[in-house]
Curated annotation (Swiss-Prot):
Any one GO MF annotation of this record: 6,7-dimethyl-8-ribityllumazine synthase activity
NCBIfam families, alphabetized: lumazine-synth
GO cellular component term of the entry, any: cytosol
Organism: Neisseria gonorrhoeae (strain ATCC 700825 / FA 1090)
Name assigned to this protein: 6,7-dimethyl-8-ribityllumazine synthase
Length: 158
């Protein structure tokens, strides 16, 4: 049996991040934690590109444009959707999540989804560090995995 070990070496990786500004006080903290973790994993600061969008529903279109540029090894989506008193929460949570997944599959690029969906601000604040750090690790590990698999596929075709 062949096993591919997880690789968290971010050296030489290019990471794009899209952060929703709605609930920015939480999202901006997540962005800081995420970038710090990427740097700890070896991703050079000049290889991290950040774009912000108004809200979670706009994240997929920005990710799609990052992905279509073919300049990135992985992408990260950061945002916060907090339940209110209307159905809008479900719409935003479901549609942003579906859009993020669609971009990943359509463009064959790993996307770490760090869009929090919580009942209240306190739950979101509690999850800032872990979710943002995990997103950075997921992006690096999956970028390395996809790059390795693509290299092997290319070698098999020769």
């Amino acid at each position: 049996m062949n096993t591919i070990a997880p690789n968290l070496d971010g050296k030489h990786l290019r990471i794009g991040i899209v952060q929703a500004r709605f609930t920015n006080e939480i999202g901006s903290q997540m962005l800081k934690v995420c970038c710090r973790t990427l740097q700890e994993l070896g991703v050079a600061d000049e290889n991290i590109t950040v774009a912000t969008v108004p809200g979670a529903l706009e994240i997929p279109i920005a990710l799609m444009n990052f992905a279509s540029s073919e300049k990135f090894d992985a992408l990260i989506a950061i945002g916060v959707v907090i339940r209110g008193e209307t159905y809008h929460f479900e719409l935003v949570a479901n549609e942003s999540g579906a859009g993020i997944g669609r971009v990943a599959l359509d463009y064959n690029i790993p996307i770490a989804n760090a869009v929090l969906t919580t009942e209240n601000d306190a739950q979101a604040i509690e999850r800032i560090g872990e979710k943002a750090s995990d997103a950075a690790k997921v992006a690096v590990e999956c970028a390395n995995l996809v790059n390795l698999l693509l290299e092997e596929q290319f070698e098999d075709e020769e």
